[in-house]
Amino acid sequence: AQLSSLAVCVNPGSAFNCYWKMPFRKKARITLENINTAEEMRLYYQINYTLTEVPEDEAYFHAQFRRSNPTQGSLHTLIDGVKGKGQYVGTYLAWRVNDNCWWGEGEIKFYMDGDKEYPTICGTGTEDYFCGSYNFENQKTRQYQEFTTPYAGMHQVIRPDGLYRAVTAFGLYRWHI
């Protein structure tokens, strides 16, 4: 599904484009892993870079993949467990629903600067964190409504046969830039 944001674009023809600033001083490493063992990974890529001085206080870019499938009870999925200096720049969440219920009331919680008992930021629901509201539901069609903006979106909904159905899958993003 098309995704049109400032940091990442998914365009027709299987074009995946990433515009994150990724400074490096000596070397850079970009790795890809094919987790679909049923298909061979075919890849075309282009990396644009400049050899310039990197300021001493410039932050590095770090990305990681996590999976919890399925969650059980009150188990929380850790989106990012990085500790130390830095700036959290965003989340991409691929989510598949395993039952016929509303799935989005999970609070997004950020624990920063040593906070442990109470989150520094505590959201009200998954759809609110991804800048949607009221179940991402289009009130006229009574279906999920895809949207894509520069900073947040739900660009993909894979529908089996209707609203609130098991095995519906979603692609959501939120950039903090």
Label the predicted regions.
Residues 1-177:
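Beta-strand-centric surfaces of beta-sandwich/beta-rich domains
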